[in-house]
UniProtKB/Swiss-Prot annotation:
NCBIfam families, per the entry: D_ala_D_alaTIGR, PRK01372.1
Protein name in UniProt: D-alanine--D-alanine ligase
GO annotation, cellular component aspect: cytosol
Main location per the UniProt record: cytoplasm
CC cofactor: Mg(2+); Mn(2+)
Length: 332
């Protein structure tokens, strides 16, 4: 897909701020994502500039004449609705979901509650506030069990617990990052991820990526800084399975009221091939190791054109009227 095929008037995009860095635990990855996006947009003739909220107040965006923002921030104070809320007040359109959808998606427990209420499959879970409650959750959910902060990304603070004796340490690690700790039933099977682009009934899933990590250890280091993890796109899954994953992620995206773009993580249980939603990322990575560019490329969208397409979708909640927030079940 070329820039001409996208039919985007680059000049009409105006002066663009690529928000990167920030103050979250994912700052380093955000700087890599933002650097890639910045270079890509400039290669397409966009008047794009780096902007780090850790060093500059967001109010400066208005003062310096920025007309829209590409959010390449990850984690807290980046994809949790706070920056989105500030940009709403400034009246500067931004990429990705709005305030409410961003804040909900950042909270894994709230996300799972909403998905479960809409009939979407997600692993059983417990919200815990102590190591004793973590041990109780382990007895109820069984082994293995995943323990992780409710509001962090990139597997930060995550532990795969295989014995009762690991519960205390796993809880302490997760609680360092968030007082709300999620214990989740582990799904043994294929790990996959699937990006979504668009809004409402126009939202569409890109090709599914199947992930093979060493000993199933798809952690922060393996995600961004090594080449030991293998990514399969095409996924190699049966066509019916891939289409079902795409259908589920689009429904999950729409149920939360997302717009612009996101990426959902899904496990396929080996015993019966049933897919389970784990979480949705509303400001996915755009590094050299990132998965949205890989999937987009498989569907014929280059990295620069992907960045341009996402930027062109920048909007404000005030312009949406909550359009596309209803769940609904859409085919892909």
């Amino acid at each position: 897909m070329s820039q001409n095929d996208l039919k985007i008037d680059v000049k009409a995009l105006g002066k663009v701020a690529v928000l990167m860095g920030g103050t979250s635990a994912e700052r380093e990855v955000s700087l890599m994502s933002g650097g890639g996006v910045l270079q890509a947009l400039r290669s397409r003739g966009v008047d794009a500039h780096a902007f780090d909220p850790a060093h500059s107040d967001l109010s400066e965006l208005k003062a310096h004449g920025y007309s829209r923002c590409f959010i390449a921030l990850h984690g807290r104070h980046g994809e949790d609705g706070t920056v989105q809320g500030a940009l709403e007040l400034l009246g500067i359109p931004y990429t990705g979901p709005g305030v409410m959808a961003s804040s909900i998606a950042m909270d894994k427990i709230m996300t799972k509650r909403i998905w479960r209420a809409d009939g979407l499959p997600t692993p059983d879970w417990r919200l815990v506030s102590s190591s004793a409650e973590t041990a109780q959750a382990f007895q109820e959910l069984g082994a293995p069990m995943i323990v992780k902060p409710s509001r962090e990304g990139s597997t930060i603070g995550l532990t795969k617990v295989t014995s009762l004796g690991q519960c205390e340490q796993a809880y302490r690690l997760a609680a360092q990052h968030d007082p709300e700790v999620l214990c989740e039933q582990f799904i043994d099977g294929d790990e996959t991820t699937c990006p979504i682009l668009g809004q409402g009934t126009e939202a569409r899933a890109l090709p599914v990526i199947r992930i093979e990590a060493p000993q199933g250890n798809y952690d922060y280091q393996n995600k961004y800084f090594t080449d030991v993890t293998q990514y399969h796109c095409p996924s190699g899954l049966p066509e019916a399975e891939e289409r079902e994953i795409q259908r589920i992620v689009v429904q999950a995206y729409r149920t939360l009221g997302c717009r612009g773009w996101a990426r959902a993580d899904i496990m396929i249980r080996a015993s019966d091939r049933k897919p389970f939603l784990l979480e949705i990322n509303t400001s996915p990575g755009m590094t050299g190791h990132s998965l949205v560019p890989m999937s987009a490329n498989a569907s014929g969208i280059s990295y620069p054109d992907l960045c341009l397409r996402i930027l062109a979708s920048a909007s404000l909640d005030a312009l949406q009227g909550r359009a596309g927030a209803a769940g609904g079940r859409e085919s892909v």
